[in-house]
């Protein structure tokens, strides 16, 4: 806050000097008026716009210096026209100062930042490690189809908004904000908006979280805080929790995007010691106790005024406003994302464009590569990665590989796997699947998974609304390898059959696609979040999964029962069942 006040005072002094008139009888009146107006105007502007107050690498301070110079120039021009002719030479000299400042600022910024002069530095912002295709299965572990992300952001936000619509007293003053995906762990006691007390348990579960926000200035003025947040499972659209109490204490979220004055989250950070820091990517996350925080990326430019690199994060308590700053290596384990996707997309493009210099990137474009549109989150063993396809410049549907970038550390791996990009995968399903075409379904943005060692796009399908109407799998390596069905389990079964019958590449070593029924004895069975986990006497060291949506008999399964099952035998520790039937069982 001090920086904003001091700089507004500095601008006021400039205006006062420009307005000063030695010949006037009231020579102090005009400077005081001009300086006071300047101080108030720029003070309010600073508090509203919150520029980054750092001389090098950020535009905010330079822009305000230029504005101050122009402000002085305007006063100077007025006095040159109406003032004492004897002072005109002084005013002309004063006019040269703001013009010189503007030109100097422009030259310094361009010279220190332009890709033409710093192409090598831009190309080295991201340093991917090229790894063999065969290592993909080791780096990205397969997960059960029931744990794949089937609820997109827009769908999660719609589900949450419908929940609050059923509460008129709350819905009239609040609404849910932007949903952020996190990998949630922990067990904590909550009370929901419906008054239900329960204990929630999450084990590396992907969920969408969103805070309750104010509906405008007057709602903030009346209430100051909101009553909680919403959790929506990214796997199961029926698993929604509107949390208003945590461990017996009512939630009161104060520092929000919809807050005003000092309660607005960015202004709160800027006015509490972080005016000179680059801040971006305000994401909501929960710790292992369900406590809500803002996780904000701290960054600094590495090439003049560009080449932004994340250096750490701020963790802000959404209730108390307490701010903790962490370096990347010291951030709490529950923090998922520090690296903003917008930074990484720029760095991927810079890496792909400037490997052979700026001139080649602009003209010949030999070997120039770029990121495919958009990025998506990929999860493996509790860690999250940004996924981006890599394609040759100007390519529409093909990709020459893909990158996985750790969302905390920026560790980057490049898989040089030729195939199709995300847009092409969507078009394959919409155009080549007869069921999808006849149903007039649209494919949503895909997420990359390891399906028995094969890099595979998984996507949801929607009809007229945003509710899921189907599910699809498409191989990254071949547009001929795809399947779509009404449930994820059926789509996966069809996809595995397609791979088995017409694969143009080998399934990862040790994977055997077998559909024959195998007789097993149930050693143990538990249900967690709608997914059944089963152990068999005949198979040690592995657990099998399924849902009652795919196999209704699972709800009646007990220990020591004999069952017929089929599955794809892989090296994974958790395997999805392809079929399940209890022997001699009748309802």
For the regions a protein language model found, what residue spans apply to each?
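Soluble extracytoplasmic regions of secretory-pathway and membrane proteins
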Residues: 4-587
